[in-house]
């Protein structure tokens, strides 16, 4: 048995279908594809995994591996040893300098990274110690997505064991809410998913055909009406502004702001919404957060903020998914909406995973159906109050840093 197969015999086999996405540089992609595609063809045949590589001329590409757990791990093993072979063949500068370790960058939804890190970093520390590989979870989201890069470095055998343990963790902790996947060749705009409505994706895309819309309906399991491009008939979506206001505990506001304001700037850029965090009032345990912009921008900004809070709660000792009853979930109804909010967008929302949309042809603005003349019955604006993760108030703000 070769060393590339040694790590595949450990642990019980899981009878499920696994999908693993990796971010690779152009040189790495070229090595995996090989001359006339011979290398990737051999990996597909020997591992029985389905391997796709995203198109595009950008420096980075997404490699997606799908199949049974045995097939996926076998493919990862072959990729790791191929990259190690390339590093051995590369001429060393100076002769005495040791070659760099093999590095794989996994792409994982941010809502699952909290479980991967564990309480106070205990889980990721355990993975490092038991596998011998170096693992680091990026502190920032990948551009225009709700995913993070998880970097795994070391010798091929250590990487294989590490990927096994990472996959075991993410399989036990499914992603929460909608996932906006990272794709280097796409410039995703804002996304809104709402009950009795389709989804809206704005960006630089080509034409969409009714056949493609039907395919999206089948993939998502929900109807996607092919309607007018206007959110509210006769009005430009970019001009329909409204505001939402909610409270965030002082001990969690740091994860929303980020180091030197990096996180809040990222959320503003991704959502296109204006986000204002109020000053801390004397004796108050919460901070006011006001989001202003189009309904689409507000929905995405609210989701991104909630994802930050969920990650911070998981790393601070809270149980993932055990949010207080008054914690707003992704794409929840408007919290404190101004009268200018379009009534048709105040429906009860739900989240659809966008992961299935990767690999489809470029999609333009898929319009929402015309808004109803009045708000849905029984819906009233409210202000949700978020409790601290441990139910107490802390004097100092909790800071979130990458592990």
UniProtKB/Swiss-Prot annotation:
Tissues expressing this chain: Widely expressed, with highest levels in testis and lowest in heart.
GO cellular component, one term: cytoplasm
Parts of the chain that traverse the membrane: none
SMART domains named among the record's database cross-references: KH
Keyword presence, Cytoplasm: yes
Top-rank taxon, per record: Eukaryota
Claim: Cytoplasm is one of the keywords in the record: yes
PANTHER family for this protein: KH DOMAIN CONTAINING RNA BINDING PROTEIN
Name of the protein: Poly(rC)-binding protein 4
Lineage: Eukaryota, Metazoa, Chordata, Craniata, Vertebrata
Gene: Pcbp4
């Amino acid at each position: 048995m070769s060393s590339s197969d040694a790590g595949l015999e450990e642990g019980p086999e899981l009878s499920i279908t696994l999908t693993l996405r990796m971010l690779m540089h152009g040189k790495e992609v070229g090595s995996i594809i090989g001359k006339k595609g011979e290398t990737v063809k051999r990996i597909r045949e020997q591992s029985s995994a389905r391997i796709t590589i995203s198109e595009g001329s950008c420096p980075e590409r997404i490699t997606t591996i799908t199949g049974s757990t045995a097939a996926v791990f076998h493919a990862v093993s072959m990729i790791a040893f191929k990259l190690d072979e390339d590093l051995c063949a590369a001429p060393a500068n100076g002769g005495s300098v040791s070659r760099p370790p093999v590095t794989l960058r996994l792409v994982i939804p941010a809502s699952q990274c909290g479980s991967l890190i564990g309480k106070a970093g205990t889980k990721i520390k355990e993975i490092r110690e038991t596998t011998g590989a170096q693992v680091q979870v990026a502190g920032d989201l990948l551009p225009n997505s709700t995913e993070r890069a998880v970097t795994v470095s070391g010798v091929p055998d250590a990487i294989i064991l590490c990927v096994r343990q990472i996959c075991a963790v993410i399989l036990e902790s499914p992603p929460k809410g909608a996932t906006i996947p990272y794709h280097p060749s796409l410039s995703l705009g804002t996304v809104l998913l709402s009950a009795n409505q389709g989804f809206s994706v704005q960006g630089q895309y080509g034409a969409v055909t009714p056949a493609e819309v039907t395919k999206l309906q089948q993939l998502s399991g929900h109807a996607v009406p092919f309607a007018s491009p206007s959110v509210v008939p006769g009005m430009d979506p970019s001009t329909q502004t409204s505001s939402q206001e909610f409270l965030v505990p002082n001990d969690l506001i740091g994860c929303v702001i980020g180091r030197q304001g990096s996180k809040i700037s990222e959320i503003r850029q991704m959502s296109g919404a204006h986000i204002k965090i109020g000053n801390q009032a004397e004796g108050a345990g919460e901070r006011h957060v006001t989001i202003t912009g189009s309904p689409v921008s507000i929905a995405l900004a609210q989701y991104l903020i909630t994802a930050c809070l969920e990650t911070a709660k998981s790393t601070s000792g809270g149980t993932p998914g055990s949010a207080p009853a008054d914690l707003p979930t992704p794409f929840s109804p408007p919290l404190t909406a101004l009268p200018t909010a379009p009534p048709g967008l105040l429906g009860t929302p739900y989240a659809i995973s966008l992961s299935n949309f990767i690999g489809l042809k470029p999609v333009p603005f898929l319009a929402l159906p015309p808004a109803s003349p009045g708000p849905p019955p029984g819906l009233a604006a409210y202000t949700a109050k978020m409790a601290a993760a441990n139910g107490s108030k802390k004097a100092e703000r909790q800071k979130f840093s990458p592990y």
